[in-house]
Amino acid sequence: MALAVLRVLEPFPTETPPLAVLLPPGGPWPAAELGLVLALRPAGESPAGPALLVAALEGPDAGTEEQGPGPPQLLVSRALLRLLALGSGAWVRARAVRRPPALGWALLGTSLGPGLGPRVGPLLVRRGETLPVPGPRVLETRPALQGLLGPGTRLAVTELRGRARLCPESGDSSRPPPPPVVSSFAVSGTVRRLQGVLGGTGDSLGVSRSCLRGLGLFQGEWVWVAQARESSNTSQPHLARVQVLEPRWDLSDRLGPGSGPLGEPLADGLALVPATLAFNLGCDPLEMGELRIQRYLEGSIAPEDKGSCSLLPGPPFARELHIEIVSSPHYSTNGNYDGVLYRHFQIPRVVQEGDVLCVPTIGQVEILEGSPEKLPRWREMFFKVKKTVGEAPDGPASAYLADTTHTSLYMVGSTLSPVPWLPSEESTLWSSLSPPGLEALVSELCAVLKPRLQPGGALLTGTSSVLLRGPPGCGKTTVVAAACSHLGLHLLKVPCSSLCAESSGAVETKLQAIFSRARRCRPAVLLLTAVDLLGRDRDGLGEDARVMAVLRHLLLNEDPLNSCPPLMVVATTSRAQDLPADVQTAFPHELEVPALSEGQRLSILRALTAHLPLGQEVNLAQLARRCAGFVVGDLYALLTHSSRAACTRIKNSGLAGGLTEEDEGELCAAGFPLLAEDFGQALEQLQTAHSQAVGAPKIPSVSWHDVGGLQEVKKEILETIQLPLEHPELLSLGLRRSGLLLHGPPGTGKTLLAKAVATECSLTFLSVKGPELINMYVGQSEENVREVFARARAAAPCIIFFDELDSLAPSRGRSGDSGGVMDRVVSQLLAELDGLHSTQDVFVIGATNRPDLLDPALLRPGRFDKLVFVGANEDRASQLRVLSAITRKFKLEPSVSLVNVLDCCPPQLTGADLYSLCSDAMTAALKRRVHDLEEGLEPGSSALMLTMEDLLQAAARLQPSVSEQELLRYKRIQRKFAAC
């Protein structure tokens, strides 16, 4: 992409679309024929992601002069500048788009009035844009965010109710406000207060234009900044420039369904404080509080400045600057960083004694040469100002400017110091100080670590070692990184798999080396991931006493007086039960990552999709509800699979078929949104992968249409489960049933009923077969029962379905096992059922053919206190409903009569019998189809259809799976329990 300069053309031609560009004559661009499109993006932005597509027109009648030497120019309107969040004279990257993507479908919103009038040729449109007169708004586009609206585009028009009609050009209101003109003596000595917000880079305070006018300050003026709290007397005021904060370029937001004209990027009364300045001020990065702003009145003017000029007062330059490199686990303190520091101080920097300076290292040659991978392993280096030498400045603190022209820089060694947190360009979830969905755990971890950082922390007894437990991918490392960033601690992450060795002595040496390295960069947190790998012998079966003794010594015998600043250890594990007891007791603090609630999953999804274009039909709240039981890693995998599904959809749609690599790149530059079908496909893939694990919860896809008959049974089940969900106020009255027991002959649809209830009520379904929980090891069976209920609580709202319950919970005292395993399993199951009263969104459904074999304690109130009999279908009407439900997806010949088929069947049939009937009929149809294909009597492309003959042949061979004597026995059992 070539570099170009944007120039505002005023007045902009009224006959030209406001989001088009005019090419002055003599420029390097090709002839602006009909249909020429340019892709624009700000020069400083990453080339990844979509660009803005604009129509390029010739501008010979605009009164412009011939293009001279220098960068090419693009003549634009102020509306386009606002969309790009740029000013006149800004640099952009532009390239000609040979084949802009053609839109296959577009949704237009219009108020009462005329619709879209006739157009000549295709029209370049963008999602969220208001088209020229008559002014419909583009609400949604497919497959790209922007493209050509032409004769091949299918249009859907809807009426905008209660929405303002937004126009891209609004006359004089689009002009920026005039700069403030305030005399310096008019506000001399005035102290103002602003609410601080962490963000921005450099050493400048970012404010809105209206806030700058309210403060009576000039753009780029120097001010003293200090905390407004009375208790913050330990930190001295700092110097900073005041800059107007301009909107940032984000095409996904500007082309969103609800996008509108850009306003101020920051509300009045707020100031965007850079992270380094906030750290040097001693502010809490999460609670900045109020800041006192006072104008820097007394300044110095350089003696070489002569003549009549107007300069804002500023701090003097330092003659000498003595700094120390801050020890960090990410870089060496012995390297030669003269070139890095020289390039950093080519721009004047504010320095004060005791400040921590952040020096970026991106693109520095010295950093690349010092890295064995030839890639930078860290984004910044930190230095601490030890001493400044210069003329005594006026003001509440000694603040200077330092640069390569006026200042001599001296490196005087290394030091131990906390460092500020710096925002990155990555996803807001991983780099956030308070990761969405994990805020409470971060606060809890900070509360454990913070006392050691207080002035009297060295006098505290004990250690601050923390054991963090949670399943894989739940965000343990993210939580530790956020806590370290919040407290200004260095983080040294060490996977315990890298500490394992052939002998105990080698493991001991590695452990001591890691702790020694961590002590050299205090205050720090040493993060040991998968700590359960330590303390095991080579076979992984026994415990290594020597390694455990060394680890306990390193964790517990740290002298707090000699460890200031402190070194704290956080260990993570996904299998706390495998952690040796001696290692676990060395951690006085234990934290567990809780299961994500629906609201937390929603906040994580919003953070992950913050910079992704989404279709208007995507409902993140509904998606979060369907992701019950997911951890942070699963939600990230969901976004990855959704993006892959969107790319596959675009390639298979025919739009990208046959295009060159350049054309596909232009399609990506236009941007394409993630649709609800992409998320649905990705969610299905993840749930299929999870279902391969034992007892993985998921929402089934069985509806009431798949369940024929059983109307009374459906009613009883819905009253038991759906009523508490729709009317939670009844729970305060104690009107809640814990469990539901379905009993009856085999094949009557008990499992299908439970799945249909889970689907219709949007509940997660956890199916458990009774025998699969029984284990040969002592205590393992009871643990399996506990894990089932723990997974259900994590995936709440959830239904636990116990199939073949009589094999899991028989009457106690009658089992023949010598160890009493079944009795203990029943006792554990009873204890878990009693604990469901505190969990309102977990329901238990059991299914059995023999309720008389169950332990009587299971049928008492508060457990399986609702018994529902699911019997066979004995009347033709119920059998017809079941048969219709089974065959509703089949292709039947018009001559097929299901009533006549049932007349040829035995009188008493279960749902499994009718399913067997349809299966046999389908097998007969397949055999007939194969025979016809071999004889050439039927084309291979014709659909397979069931005939009346196929169904009658299957009905003639059908035998009931439950005899009349067995049905009578089940009815006697039903009467027995109904009388109780």
Swiss-Prot record:
Binding site for ATP: 470-477, 744-751
Homology family: Belongs to the AAA ATPase family.
Known outcome of mutating residue 532 to N: In B1 mutant; abolished ATP hydrolysis; does not affect interaction with PEX6 or PEX26
Assembly behavior: Interacts with PEX1; forming the PEX1-PEX6 AAA ATPase complex, which is composed of a heterohexamer formed by a trimer of PEX1-PEX6 dimers. Interacts with PEX26; interaction is direct and promotes recruitment to peroxisomal membranes. Interacts with ZFAND6.
Outcome of mutating residue 274 to L: In HMLR2; results in severe functional decrease in peroxisome biogenesis
Organism: Homo sapiens
GO BP, sorted A to Z: peroxisome organization; protein import into peroxisome matrix; protein import into peroxisome matrix, receptor recycling; protein import into peroxisome matrix, translocation; protein stabilization; protein targeting to peroxisome; protein unfolding
Effect of residue 476 to E: In A1 mutant; abolished ATP-binding; decreased interaction with PEX1 or PEX26
Reaction(s) this enzyme catalyzes, per UniProt: ATP + H2O = ADP + phosphate + H(+)
Outcome when changing residue 99 to L: In HMLR2; uncertain significance
SMART domains (alphabetical): AAA (SM00382)
Cystine crosslinks: none
Omega-N-methylarginine: residues carrying this PTM: 119
EC number(s) on file: 3.6.4.-
Keywords: Amelogenesis imperfecta, ATP-binding, Cell projection, Cytoplasm, Deafness, Disease variant, Hydrolase, Membrane, Methylation, Nucleotide-binding, Peroxisome, Peroxisome biogenesis, Peroxisome biogenesis disorder, Repeat, Zellweger syndrome
Outcome reported for the amino acid change (mutating residue 601 to Q): In HMLR2; uncertain significance; results in mild functional decrease in peroxisome biogenesis
Name of protein: Peroxisomal ATPase PEX6
Implicated disorder: Peroxisome biogenesis disorder complementation group 4: A peroxisomal disorder arising from a failure of protein import into the peroxisomal membrane or matrix. The peroxisome biogenesis disorders (PBD group) are genetically heterogeneous with at least 14 distinct genetic groups as concluded from complementation studies. Include disorders are: Zellweger syndrome (ZWS), neonatal adrenoleukodystrophy (NALD), infantile Refsum disease (IRD), and classical rhizomelic chondrodysplasia punctata (RCDP). Peroxisome biogenesis disorder 4A: A fatal peroxisome biogenesis disorder belonging to the Zellweger disease spectrum and clinically characterized by severe neurologic dysfunction with profound psychomotor retardation, severe hypotonia and neonatal seizures, craniofacial abnormalities, liver dysfunction, and biochemically by the absence of peroxisomes. Additional features include cardiovascular and skeletal defects, renal cysts, ocular abnormalities, and hearing impairment.
Pfam families in the record: AAA (PF00004), DPBB_PEX6 (PF25395), PEX6_vert_N (PF25394)
Principal location listed in the UniProt entry: cytoplasm
Tissue specificity of this protein: Expressed in the retina, at higher levels in the photoreceptor layer at the joint between the outer and inner segments.
